[in-house]
């Protein structure tokens, strides 16, 4: 599993070099970090105010992120220097912060530390879903583990 994660991190770093400017803004520190929502075919998910999809890392423990070092180049932590704010369907009562390395505050939602994915682009905004244990979150704070819709039964009788 660790080797798989390292390979994915390396692949993500390569993709980062090509796609980092895609959103024109990273998920770095902001005095008024805003968490909002956006609708996709698999549900309403959390995004930044600039539209970047937010993810949780299933391997995180409260206050102890599993993603460190090079992993953070691929999965940047959503940081804040002030109190995070909710917009859209996001709930202010579920927002919080966790102190990470260097005393930096990482935004949390329903206890989950939030990350963006460096390889997401405007044309593929949820490409990190399911990679290495990272998942998008619903407005209730639940992880969404599948972004594919189930096909409807055929009406042709076959």
Predicted features along the sequence, with ranges:
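Compact beta-sheet-dominated domain cores in extracellular/mature segments
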Residues: 2-9, 16, 21-158
């Amino acid at each position: 599993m660790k080797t798989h994660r390292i390979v994915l991190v390396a692949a993500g770093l390569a993709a980062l070099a090509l796609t980092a400017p895609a959103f024109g803004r990273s998920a770095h520190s902001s005095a008024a970090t805003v968490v909002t929502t956006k609708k996709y075919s698999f549900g309403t998910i959390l995004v930044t105010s600039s539209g970047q999809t937010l993810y949780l890392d299933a391997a995180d423990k409260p206050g102890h992120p599993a993603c460190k070092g090079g992993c953070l180049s691929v999965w940047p932590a959503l940081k804040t220097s002030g109190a995070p704010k909710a917009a859209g369907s996001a709930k202010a009562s579920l927002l919080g912060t966790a102190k990470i390395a260097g005393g930096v505050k990482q935004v949390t939602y329903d206890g989950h530390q939030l990350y963006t994915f460096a390889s997401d682009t405007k044309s593929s905004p949820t490409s990190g879903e399911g990679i290495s244990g990272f998942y998008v979150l619903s407005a209730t704070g639940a992880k969404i583990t599948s972004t594919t819709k189930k096909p409807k039964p055929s009406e042709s009788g076959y």
